[in-house]
Amino acid sequence: MAEEDDSPIPEERFTPEPDASSSPEGAPGNGGLDEDVALAINGQYIKDLSFEAPHTPEIYNDLQTEMPEIKVDIDVGAEAKAESLFEVMIKCRAEARIDDKLVYLTEIEYAGLFTINVEPEALGPVLLIECPLILFPFMRRIISDLTGDGGFAPLMLSPIDFAALYQQRMMQA
């Protein structure tokens, strides 16, 4: 049996209070955040979501003996909403098939609203690389939960190289 610890709980805070010297000039009372932060996420949300498994429950018999072929397509996009305010979207389509029979199809458009204050030449990489990197883990969890809740093994998407996607897009432009 463990001994009880009778040591008093310290009265000081575990996280120090910010003092005036830790706050950027011109930013009193904002918790130390600069008003011209290069990137801030204002919110994130599902814009569109669908899941289809048209051959359940019969497909479960096929899954006992065969592994489905899974094809995943990812695309990113961005749209200006106001000055320094951008909506960034990741679209993902995942399709599982055994031969020509659809096991499941899921599509999601996951988005975030970002305030971005960077030089114009840096805007493209921030919108199409940095912002999707922030959104991707949340979208990945939704897809995993959705396929698992659909009665299948959860689909765990591999990390996406958004920098390579961006470079590919620039070469095609």
Where are these regions (language model features)?
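N-terminal intrinsically disordered, cationic/polar leader segments
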Residues: 2-134, 141-173
